[in-house]
Amino acid sequence: MNNKSLLYPVASTSRRVVSLDGMWRFRFDPKSEGVDADWANGLPESISMPVPASFCDFFTDKESREYCGDFWYETDFFVPGEWSGKDIAIRFGSATHHARVFVNGVEVAQHEGGFLPFDAVVTDIVRYNQYNKLSVLLNNELNEYMLPAGNTATLSNGKKVAAPYFDFYNYAGIHRPVKLMALPAERVLDYSVKHRLTADGAEVDYTVTTNGSHDVTVELYDGTTKVAEASGKEGTLVVKDAKLWNVHAAYLYNIVIRIHDGSAIVDEYTEKIGIRTFEIQNGHFLLNGKPVYLRGFGKHEDADIRGRGLDLATVKRDYELMKWIGANCFRTSHYPYAEELYQMADEEGFLIIDEVPAVGFMESTMNFLAANQGNGKKVGWFEKETTPQLLANHKDALTDMIDRDKNHASVIAWSILNEPQCTSEGTEAYFKTLFDLAHELDPQKRPRTYAIVMMSLPHNSKGQQFADFISLNRYYGWYVMGGMGIVDAEAAFRKEMDGWAKVLNGRPMIFTEYGADTMPTEHKLPSVMWSQEYQNEYLDMNHNVFDSYDFVQGELVWNFADFQTTEGIMRANGNKKGIFTRQRQPKDAAFHFRARWTSLPLDYKGNK
């Protein structure tokens, strides 16, 4: 049986979890010689490197920061003798982008994709009561079949350079926690829940997957009080007077799943879950049957020095800022985030649109970062010669994202792609496959969407009919008709909106991106583009448009904070559309948003 499991590592009476985070050994491998040279049995001439973190911004020389190719991590871990008889596994929260894992010189796993977890069972390879060697060979090169998409160029000096088709920096490394686990041979591999509200409480339907045949029980606890129980791998928990999970009023129960062999407990897995429903009816988003207007951000996992590496201090600051400003939602642009962010969203009562890392799916000549550097290669997406491998990778990432995140109360929708080229032949078949797969995989049948790029309009967006709600990325007043032209920008914006009104067929619309680059030190009277005054004028124009259309049911501004991108003439040390600086301090627009969002009722437009 396939023992793959994306359950978050939790210690229990039957499970042991040890963190392997810390200072590892590290070195580049520009000639790709490490495997043949047996570096998996000992990494020569290494330097120290923190895990989790991106390697890039620790270096002071550009060649190291921009390194593209193979690179290695190595550490040692101890396996206690009392773990004998259990399955020993090593789990990576993520590693960017292509990974090969070795234990004591033996290859134990390979993984493609830099934003989702994977593990390796190493029971037969580890040595007990002594230290073992863990080596990881990573590669951060980009290609047109991967998520996210790009290519890799070679300079005249022979050095490789990443040419992303996406507008964020190609950070690389072991970005999320690494865990050593001791697991029972027969164990819980997965579970799923879906919720129904009843007149006197709620019902939680569950399904449990194990790798054995022993009996299963499921219990639900409110603190230390058991409020529901059931037996069997499928069943229903009946919760009287259920306390529902809600926006900024999150309530979490503990679900406890056990495998029994007579009176003995073979395995126990526990996790926090919230009871809530989310659906679309009559053009509105309904949380627990009540309308909710989405307000918040597109974000990035991005911060000074650690790059894309998980940093709980930054995560905490971000949530405090989002609470302060009155936000209730964010999109995990443009990839699934670390699991710890979803856990905090569950705790704090934030809504998440969860996005697979399908970004850069346009002709690269249309991507100003790649084209600006001369690295653009004209590629039409969803063509016959590119689709099979791309689609296979896309399906794998979508499957793992839903498998990992399906039980989070905070996750309300799936975003299948960001700004794809959706006007070309092959779009409809490609999109239908993925939207159908998302519906099939998700027990809760959450709404599905994708972020529609500026040049995709109501009459030529061939995939929009598959979306349960429309998500637009629009930059009227910035990339088009900026400055004095903002008056014409508003007119053009409204003309497009009138076109969308004819094809929505009762679906709601949200804006998943809108924003203007703004230097935090730039004030100008009268305003000019890049000044804080212009950012506020731009936002006012957009909000006037949003407020004019009842079918607009959400606004997620781009971006929460300034973030790093590939260098180029269009980016001044990164994307500066943040409402906060990269150091998480407010620009003037933050106070602008706080005034707006804290005054809008949760059910804004809910009766229209």
Descriptions of predicted regions:
Residues M1-M344, E348-I352, A397, I412-A413, ...:
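Secreted/periplasmic carbohydrate-active enzymes, especially glycoside hydrolases
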Residues T207, Y319-L321, C329-S599, K605-G606:
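Substrate-binding/catalytic cleft of secreted carbohydrate-active enzymes
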